[in-house]
Design a protein with these regions (language model features):
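Helix-loop junctions at membrane interfaces in 12-TM secondary transporters
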Residues: 95-112, 307-319
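A membrane-interface helix-boundary motif in multi-pass transporters
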Residues: 75-77, 165-185, 372-392
């Protein structure tokens, strides 16, 4: 029996279209879930749990990722089913604002957990599948371009959503949130359709790729990849001490309107769009590790900037810095995983990476929710004390772990200062490397 020919070009086209609709959904679900929770009456601790519990259970679910792929019969079949389930759960969120019940926040949390678990199971399958299509030498440039393009859709989604909520202010915020999450559900259904049009390359099994989580952890001293995972988990823990609460600080403490909130989110997303291809080209040139070290240091400083001023114009600059820094972190970290792990081990290693990272995120969010209501005020606000603690922890993990792992492929040498000057355009490395 002849194996079906895999059309890589058509699969990448379908994946790109999936990314467009997924990005539209993400612009709503990732940036307006906390505003919805606050609208439904959530406390600071509940906001922390809304961020923490979905990520924890999503990460734990990834222990089952490899088994579920085998049980369903392939990565692609699993992806389609999970995406359609996600769309259905998002549709349920759309009706929550209309329900007259005391458990609306708890219902939102439960639905977000189900959505996150579906996403957690889908992550390793998608990462393994998409990297089968693209050679390692082109991944930085490709994902930089792809992320920038779908990021533009996320940006548009954030803007449209903010304008919708602002315009519904005199009508009904319940109707506004219903419209937003109903649109997100429809976009996710469309995303599932385009995933179903992709082809699945043959996936060869390797006995060496069958290793347990404990076997994975036990190789800390020998494994360069595991030391990277520990660094990433430390940075994630420190980041999520404060990350879920910036929206709370803006909407509850500073009393910003949804329009101002939207504008600040747009600044971050726009900076990320501009920076992604720059980081991608430099990652291909000097390696993902150098890009990750620089961008994670820049990201570590972000909470400290919130202590200086709360003027919206100033915070726009802070958000631009944040979007620039985090785009480098996410792109280089993902590409390092793809470079450091063989295709046969990729699903399992991505799953274990997400398990550890998800546990760190849960601990950070849960502890942040507790500390946010317990720490003494700093400059008049309790959450500013939490931001200061987060900054201190970010820098601490950076100094302890950023140099514990190394690049896995040949690259051009460059210092951190040379890389920074090149990324911002002062003294480009890319032009010199081609001379």
């Amino acid at each position: 029996m002849r194996r079906k020919r895999v059309d890589v070009r058509e699969s990448l086209r379908s994946s790109f279209k999936d990314g467009i609709f997924a990005a539209f959904m993400a612009g709503i679900t990732e940036h307006y879930a906390t505003p919805l929770a606050l609208f439904l009456g959530a406390t600071v601790q509940q906001v922390g749990l809304i961020s923490a519990l979905p990520h924890l259970l999503a990460s734990v679910s990834q222990f089952l990722a490899v088994r579920v792929i085998h049980w369903i019969g392939g990565r692609l079949k699993l992806l389609v089913r999970l995406v359609l389930c996600q769309a259905s759960f998002i549709l349920c969120i759309a009706i929550l604002p209309w329900l007259d019940t005391a458990q609306r926040v708890e219902s939102l949390t439960a639905l977000l957990i189900l959505i996150a678990v579906c996403g957690g199971l889908a992550g390793p399958a998608w990462g393994s599948l998409i990297t089968d299509y693209i050679p390692s030498s082109k991944r930085g440039r490709y994902f930089g371009w792809r992320n920038r393009t779908v990021g533009a859709v996320t940006l548009a989604s954030i803007i449209i959503s903010g304008l919708v909520l602002y315009s519904f202010g005199e009508i009904s915020y319940s109707a506004g949130f219903c419209l937003l999450f109903g649109s997100a559900a429809l976009a996710r259904f469309a995303s599932g359709y385009f995933i179903s049009r992709m082809d699945e390359p043959p996936h060869r099994s390797d006995p060496a790729s069958d290793f347990t989580f404990l076997m994975f952890i036990a190789r800390f001293r020998q494994s360069n990849f595991l030391r990277f995972v520990v660094f990433s988990a430390g940075l994630t823990f420190a980041t999520y001490l404060s990350a879920p609460f910036f929206a709370v600080f803006m909407l509850r403490d500073l009393q910003f309107s949804y329009l101002t909130y939207m504008g600040l989110q747009v600044c971050s997303s726009f900076a990320s769009l501009v920076a992604l291809p720059l980081w991608g080209r430099h990652a291909d040139l000097v390696g993902n590790v150098r890009v990750l070290r620089l961008s994670s240091f820049l990201a570590a400083l972000i909470p400290a900037f919130w202590l200086i001023s709360h003027d919206p114009a100033y915070l726009m600059l802070v958000q631009i810095w944040g979007g620039f820094a985090w785009s480098g972190v996410t792109l280089s970290a993902a590409n390092f995983i793809y470079d450091a792990v063989t295709p046969q081990k990729r699903v399992r290693c991505i799953a274990y990476f997400n398990v550890i990272n998800g546990a760190a995120l849960f601990l950070g969010s849960a502890l942040g929710g507790f500390l946010g209501s317990q720490l003494p005020p700093l400059l008049g606000y309790g959450l500013l004390s939490l931001f200061a603690v987060s900054c201190f922890c970010r820098l601490g993990f950076y100094l302890l772990l950023a140099r514990s792992f190394r690049e896995v492929r040949p690259t051009q040498k460059a210092s951190t200062r040379e890389l920074l000057f090149s990324v911002v355009g002062i003294r480009p490395l890319i032009g010199r490397s081609q001379e």
